[in-house]
A protein has these predicted regions:
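Active-site loop architecture of trypsin-fold serine endopeptidases
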Residues: 184-198
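Surface-exposed, glycine-biased beta-strand/turn segments
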Residues: 30-128, 132-136, 177, 186, ...
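Beta-strand/loop nucleic-acid-binding surfaces
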Residues: 146-155
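Short glycine/serine/proline-enriched coil/turn segments at secondary-structure junctions
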Residues: 120-122, 139-140, 190-193
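Acidic, glycine-rich catalytic/binding loops that coordinate metals and/or anionic ligands
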Residues: 44-46, 138, 142-145, 158-179, ...
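Hydrophobic alpha-helical membrane-insertion segments, chiefly the h-region
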Residues: 19-30
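Soluble periplasmic/extracytoplasmic beta-strand elements of cell-envelope proteins
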Residues: 98, 130, 148, 198-203
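N-terminal Sec-pathway targeting helices
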Residues: 2-20
Length: 243
């Protein structure tokens, strides 16, 4: 199963703005702050895209260890536009990080392994790989976890940007931290409906049988901040102090 999600950002922004402007509560007062936060995140993303150099402190760099004791490396360059738990459409809670490149072109911004582990690319995965990390002592006290990387393909899904040494059907191939996995793309899972160019990165729990859980369910994931050492600054932006 390809664990990717369509992100129609302009549509989400319009819907959120209309709902907030109309004062619709729908499921109660908790919904409005969540939608408002989504609008703010999209506005910040646009600000960063307009002039990334002016917001260098918002930019993260691949291979960086954000704090000296962070167990994982930052997996790519860019701006963390959406974090775990963020919402940019009704009924949605984001399960990981969306890290957007300023490069302006697909197949340009490298994606690397955040930690040593065993890589799998299922036979039908165009843009995704997942890495198993057994006996992860830091943060989770020896549990097995997985890191998931997706959107590494063209908008129409015909060209994969995953590194050629990881063809479809790859299972349990050891990769050290920092290994090149591929490049950021904009495949959403639906041809003709591209995402912005970015990497979706998440830290996924194991199932009872030892496989990876369904990453699209936020309850099956951990906050990447715990592993990367990312923090929110005073403006609410997810930043990596080591970048």
């Amino acid at each position: 199963m390809q664990l990717v999600k369509s992100r129609r950002y302009r549509v989400y922004l319009l819907i959120a703005a209309l709902l907030i402007g109309a004062g619709l509560l729908l499921t109660g007062v908790a919904l409005r702050p969540r939608l408002a936060a989504g609008v703010e995140q999209i506005a910040r993303l646009r600000t960063w895209f307009a002039n990334p150099a002016a917001r260098g402190d918002w930019t993260v760099l691949a291979g960086t260890r954000c704090t000296p004791d962070a167990p994982m490396l930052m997996p790519t360059d860019g701006y963390i536009g959406f974090g775990r738990g963020d919402s940019f459409r009704l009924g949605h809670r984001h399960s990981g990080y969306d890290i957007f490149t300023s490069a302006g072109a697909v197949n340009t911004t490298p994606v690397i392994a955040a930690y040593d582990g065993y890589l799998t690319r299922e036979a039908d995965w165009r843009s995704s790989v997942i890495i198993r990390h057994p006996d992860f002592q830091r943060v989770v006290g020896g549990e097995q976890i997985w890191t998931y990387y997706t959107h590494m393909a063209s908008a129409d899904g015909t060209q994969s940007f995953i590194a050629p040494q990881f063809p479809p059907g790859t299972h349990e191939l050891f990769v050290p931290a920092g290994t090149l996995l591929g490049y950021q793309g904009n495949w959403s899972g639906t041809a003709g409906n591209p995402t912005g160019i970015h990497l979706h990165f998440s830290v996924v729990k194991s199932t009872l049988s030892g496989g990876y859980a369904n990453e699209t369910d936020i309850d099956n994931t951990y906050d990447p901040a715990l592993f990367l050492g990312v923090t929110r600054n005073a403006s609410g932006v997810l930043v990596c102090e080591g970048s």
